[in-house]
A protein has these predicted regions:
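Short glycine-rich, Thr/Ser-proximal phosphate-binding strand/loop in the N-terminal lobe
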Residues: 3-50
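Short, flexible, glycine/charge-rich loop motifs used to bind or transfer phosphoryl groups or to couple energy/partner
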Residues: 1, 51-53, 87
Length: 117
């Protein structure tokens, strides 16, 4: 379980946009929210690496991707991207790289809400 206060980079990769922000475990505040269009020739590994490189003291990454997840990897259905959680964790040097199918991440979101949200 990630330690309270550790820094997390949140990434959502869709067919046309990539959304990112940072958060801290135990807090519901989001920081540095960003949305950018991605082109067909974007190297997704390099793109994620460049986003992570500007963050200091980054401990974890949660990445939500449109496509089926099999064997810790997602092959996007509408882009020619393959994202492997073990390779990304090693490349970024973070404690954890959590790779989620986009619908799975929606389920976690709704499960974390309270009646007052």
């Amino acid at each position: 379980m990630p330690k309270v206060g550790s820094k997390v980079l949140l990434i959502d990769i869709g067919g046309t946009n990539i959304r990112t922000c940072t958060a801290f475990v135990g807090s519901s505040e989001l920081h540095n929210e960003n949305k950018e269009k991605i082109s067909a020739n974007t190297n997704i590994d390099d793109y994620i690496k460049s986003i992570a490189s500007v963050e200091t003291n980054l401990d974890h990454v949660v990445c939500s991707v449109a496509g089926p997840k099999m064997n810790d990897q997602i092959n996007m259905t509408n882009r020619n991207y393959q994202i492997n959680s073990q390779q990304m964790q090693s490349m970024l040097g973070v404690q954890n790289f959590y790779l989620l199918n986009d619908r799975e991440s929606i389920g976690y979101f709704f499960n974390s809400r309270t009646e007052n949200d």
